[in-house]
């Protein structure tokens, strides 16, 4: 599988011209400036490889399909594969597993005219979560200094890990149906998502980022009264954070070569247009590389596994109790991570 993936990366130079069109700041519907993903670059192997592209999951009348960003449009890879009569990855998960790579090469190398019908404008596209069936969704608690301070939590001596399940996945422009019979205190947490690209076990901090396929914008949505139903001394991370739809992620899975240093990214949350969180990943207590090295010392990480790296200050939980106005049905949440794009969802 790894040999196939390396071959594809070497041969991917045929898409360099198309890749240079990816993710311009003027891309419709995805914001500008710091929230807009960067243009494609030439990969370390001398070609615009898979980690130098931005991928997504499209929801179409024919079913979900792998998508590839091309400036202000998205290429429906599945539809393009049918037009060229080749087998391609059906999802980002299959892309990460190395499936359908020969057909994908042909789609990427095809003249623009032959796949024109497979292009859809970004503003007309419907998106699913940018990963669909990770084996593991690993979350981090209290991993930003100022967030730990606002919640009066001592800095952890090791990464605080917990998990979510696939039922929590939610796509861009999705709707979270709040479990109001069980909880009332709903909160936002913008987080940089790390998507693994290679199997990792006991990897070093120095090598850790080489196992990453890409990054995404996500939100560790939380029900605080479930999380702390037994008091702050007995946090119930799982039940407070793993209800249906409680991990919006995407729309873009942005290749690691486009993002560069994951410790220099602006992160923001807006609620109904009001900025609530505005920070930078340089405030992390444990870096992405340290998190991967630590997690891989405990269990094997596989392609497609998600690591959500913690949230910065500005959450409702961190405010004085008299100022805590919890989220409610009808609220509109916008999250952004620099170079990864903007994620939007609504509460119902």
Predicted segments with their positions:
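N-terminal export signals
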Residues: 1, 7-30
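A generic local secondary-structure boundary/capping motif
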Residues: 43-47, 56, 127-129, 149-152, ...
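Residue-level recognition of short, solvent-exposed, well-ordered loop/turn junctions
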Residues: 132, 139, 187-189, 302, ...
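Structural signature of FAD isoalloxazine-binding scaffolds in flavoprotein oxidoreductases
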Residues: 69, 155-172, 188, 329-338
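Non-heme Fe(II) oxygenase catalytic core, chiefly the N-lobe of the double-stranded beta-helix
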Residues: 167, 171-226, 230
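N-terminal non-catalytic cap/leader segment that marks the start of a structured domain
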Residues: 5-6, 10-12, 30-159, 332-334
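Catalytic-pocket segment enriched in acidic/His residues
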Residues: 177, 222-348
């Amino acid at each position: 599988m790894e040999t196939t993936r390396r071959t594809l990366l070497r041969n991917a130079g045929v898409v360099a011209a198309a890749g240079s069109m990816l993710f311009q700041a003027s891309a419709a519907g995805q914001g500008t400036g710091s929230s807009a993903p960067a243009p494609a670059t030439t990969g370390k192997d001398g070609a615009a490889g898979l980690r130098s592209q931005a991928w997504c999951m499209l929801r179409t009348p024919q079913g979900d399909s792998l998508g590839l960003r091309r400036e202000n449009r998205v290429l429906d890879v599945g539809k393009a594969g049918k037009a060229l009569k080749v087998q391609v990855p059906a999802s980002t998960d299959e892309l990460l597993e190395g499936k359908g790579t020969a057909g994908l090469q042909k789609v990427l190398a095809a003249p623009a005219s032959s796949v024109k019908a497979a292009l859809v404008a970004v503003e007309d596209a419907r998106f699913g979560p940018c990963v669909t069936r990770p084996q593991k969704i690993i979350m981090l608690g209290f991993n930003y200094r100022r967030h730990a301070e606002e919640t009066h939590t001592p800095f952890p001596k090791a990464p605080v890990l917990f998990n979510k399940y696939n039922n929590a996945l939610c796509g861009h422009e999705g709707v979270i149906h709040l479990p109001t019979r069980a909880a009332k205190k709903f909160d936002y947490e913008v987080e940089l998502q790390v998507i693994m690209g290679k199997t990792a076990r006991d990897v070093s901090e120095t090598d850790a980022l080489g196992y990453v396929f890409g990054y995404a914008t996500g939100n560790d949505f939380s029900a605080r009264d479930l999380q702390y139903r037994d008091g702050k001394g007995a946090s119930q991370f799982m039940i407070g954070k793993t209800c249906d739809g409680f991990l919006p992620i995407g729309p873009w899975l942005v290749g690691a070569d486009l993002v560069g240093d994951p410790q220099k990214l602006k992160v923001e949350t807006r609620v109904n247009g009001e900025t609530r969180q505005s920070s930078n990943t340089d405030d992390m207590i444990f870096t992405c590389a340290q998190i991967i090295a630590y997690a891989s010392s405990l269990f094997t990480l596989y392609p497609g596994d998600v690591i959500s790296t913690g949230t910065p200050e500005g959450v409702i939980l961190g405010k004085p109790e008299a100022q805590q106005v919890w989220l409610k049905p009808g609220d509109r949440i916008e999250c952004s991570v620099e170079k990864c794009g903007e994620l939007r969802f609504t509460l119902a």
